[in-house]
Amino acid sequence: DVKGGKISAVKDKYHISVSKYETNDSIDKAFAAATKDKELTFATSAIKPEGCDLAYSVKSGDSKLMSVYLKRDSKKRYSISGIDFDKKLYKSYKISATSDAEISVNGIIVEDGDRKNEELPDIDSALTKSGSIINKQIISLDNMLNDEPQITAKSGSTALPVEKNGTVYN
């Protein structure tokens, strides 16, 4: 539903690659921003993946928005087989936080596997009084569509301030 701006309705069906931290609302918001007040134009494309019978390049104004791939069935009818957003639409973000902070992106809690401890020199365990060390962590978000994802952080029940650059303070 390109003209309606509800691209999220087809993201799973056509395997559109977006971050797991993008919600349907955030995807639709980013798509609406990319197409706002711009004419959508469709042109056939010579570049098509294997198993695809026809490909279209979709532009929003002067910028490429996506490629749409079609497959022909036995009755010679075409149906969409895939959609790829242009690489320029994707953004990457880095969030810097402590290991004890709970971080959410667009309302989705960041999974432990997406958090990496920042490299630090080895510290003699005899120098630390506590058995649990709080590490500084880096969270990398790739395949994001939004210009400004909603990042929130908390430690226990206390909300933590989040800077525009993605740094969390506690």
Predicted regions and their residues:
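Short beta-strand edge/turn micro-motifs at domain boundaries
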Residues: 57-169
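Short solvent-exposed beta->alpha transition segments
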Residues: 7-63
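Short, aromatic-enriched amphipathic alpha-helices that serve as compact interaction elements
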Residues: 1-6
